[in-house]
């Protein structure tokens, strides 16, 4: 944990207008999250506009997600070097400009290219948002602020389809991107006037940027992400080849990082139990949450017989609960301590998974919504606590890269969950006799998926308890 001397620079950098700073940071996180979800509803319209297939227009979404996933660690390191405030404002400028370019795109290729640039800006906004909460706000408000950022992320996810549909029907598809411009300009103004100036380190103390490590990490993450998304739940030789390439890039990356004087990721990070366990728990719990998003629609339609509109309405309960849970979760962290709340989040999510796996079909929608709400609330509590534990134990000059790794662990959990949990659902269905009926088959797939999800949560609990035992001060050592 930090000692008093170590925290002095952070206290000196705290914003004099923390409320405005938090408003700007929250808007940045909201925009990045909105950018992920608002395009989905436009895909049919865009396919018709550009005379493209679904496989072609889905790259409008994938390009954005891949840009974020491959760049989050690199932009975190860059923020530590050039200044987090400076980089965040630059990221907002990039995101806002790229959003306008998306709306002006005259063909699919131009739109996808603009989405890649927009994803770069979003990666900066996500990473620097978390890093600056832990640095620019008073320590006693960190938990609440982390909870608020979680809420804004959930609001962006939930709001995207509804807002996107309204904008498309009223003004046309370009306005799902143009809407980012005024919000982006507002966030830039708030952050420019509220965040403290970056404290520039002496020139001799600044590290050079690890371009080789950055390229290797990006290649590893890109090939892994493509392997997990290109084949869906069915792995083929292309997916296996991409996984092999990803493993090769990972090996070269690890070897390279031990040889350079200023590595992108300091190998000491993985020797710090509190950090490595925190990243792993984040990936594991997010994998479980992704199961509700991937498997849920199939269960609702195949087992409960809901139509598309009804499925969408039921699925919106998850983001709604997450939005309502984020701020209270942060306050619990500030009041009861991150370690205790972390365990409570695990227990809550595990209880929801057990409920989802054991709910009988005759309970209908209620048998799905109630466990979904419990899982989502548990995740919100877990996320606020885990983010606080990780970021409060990191020295100021490493907050950017650690925030990037935290975002990366979450994204990898989402990507892995989409493929692995979908495969489990299909496996569960295949183990059921075809004569059982569609509802029973889908229900059995759901049960297998969430019993495995329960095991994942319990494994994460074991990691948390082990880390707690190894760290008497209940937090990662500063790195």
Each model region followed by its residue ranges:
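Residue-level signal for the membrane-embedded core of alpha-helical transmembrane segments
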Residues: 70, 124, 219-222, 291, ...
